[in-house]
Amino acid sequence: MNPTNQNLSRRKLLKGGLASAIAWSTAPLFLSPRVLGRPGNIGPNSRINVGIVGNGLISKGHRGFCLTQPATQVVALCDVDSVILDAAMAEAKAKGVTCDAYADSRELCARPDIDAVFVTTPDHWHAAISIDAMRNGKDVYVEKPMTLTIEEGKAMRSAAERYGRIVQVGSQQRSNGSFRKAAELVLNGYIGKVDTIVCRLGEFPAPTQFAEEPVPATLDYDRWLGPTPWEPFNAARVKGDYGGGWRRFWEYGSRKNGDWGAHHFDIVQWALGMDDSGPTLFVPKGYEGEKFQYHTYANGPKVIRDGDSKGAMIRFIGDKGEILVGRDDKFETTPSNLKSLVLKSGDQQLYVSRDHRFDWIGAIKTRQQPICHVGIGHRTATICQLSGIAERLGRPVKWDPATEQIIDDPVASLMMDNPRRASYSLPI
């Protein structure tokens, strides 16, 4: 898009004709870097041209990072709400960055000069935009949870492999030294056999049927809903604050299982060495008097949501000790000397990342997998989604992590994906 026409294009798309303006294609739409006169891979000293789709609350940190880092050049911003988009554009301008504005992610993803895309939308858009970016030759940083459904996760994993793309999932606790140290101690047996793990997630308000309100002229509400069923507009439904908003609805998010579970369950997977597998049983709170939601692994550990975490985000309990870890510099061990223990040469040492976004940038340049790649993100999101399926059904769900199928439960199996409105199928 010509930068001088950016506002005109955006307003035209907001006013109408959006569904027919651009159709998903089944073929890659990008020109290779070689055709464009650029090397096949981005050089170690080259700037990465970035587009950001979704410019609300969660995007603010990513946008600020990309606008100020020498390694990245923001060339395009996208949002279905022109108020949010205008504010993001003003932020870029204030930092001396000139970029183009889009109301439709498909236009941004089709640009041949963009190398990588941040996907920081509500969860129900993660898969479609990420896959579209990948088939257009872009690497992707997608916020957690990676997808809204299990089948979307499989599709994203397949797309990354098919198109040879780098995907980093925003479960950034893997780039935190305290969480890595806790995971290494557990993985190497320093607290013995782990029987119980407690993860503190908290609760959102229950989903609510809000009264219908007029749709603001600045918002393309149909596109905000995207693949989900039509619902009357209410500002409380679409708001992106951490107190609930769209996150409290199953249609758009995974509630607290996907909000905080995507962080804490991810660290549990890492600590147990289960990045390519997962739990086998999911039990909801309230089933046969259960006080807490939990899931279990075939080899024994039980992961309890919101039990006694002793003030930590994650509490690992073994037969020889305990570890309490959180983001607020909380790192406590029993026995206490584990806190300063140095791993032995024969111990398994985990991937070290000092910064989640820099790790992604490095992976783009080296073409090596980042710390939380698409396969890891899919397995963690699967835990979030299966926990939600069990919660909604009010009964346990059994899972085969090898075949990635729900066992002997046709009703639960149908919930591995959601129906999509006809004009919003996955672009695969």
For each of these PLM feature ranges, what is it?
Residues N2-I22:
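N-terminal secretory signal peptides and thylakoid transit peptides that target proteins
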Residues G16-W24, P33, G37, G61, ...:
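C-terminal helical cap and adjacent loop that interface with cofactors, partners, or active-site loops
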Residues G17-K95, Q173-N176, V268:
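N-terminal Rossmann-like dinucleotide-binding module
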Residues V117-F118:
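N-terminal Rossmann-like NAD(P) cofactor-binding module of classical short-chain dehydrogenase/reductase
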Residues P122-D123, A127-S175, G189, G394:
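Beta-strand-loop-alpha-helix segment that lines the small-molecule cofactor/substrate pocket
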Residues A159-G164, K181-V194, E213-V215:
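Basic phosphate/pyrophosphate-binding loop/patch that engages nucleotide-derived ligands
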Residues V198-G243, M416-N418:
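Core domains of carbohydrate- and sulfate-ester-processing enzymes
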Residues D222-P301:
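Rossmann-like dinucleotide-binding domain that binds NAD(P)(H)
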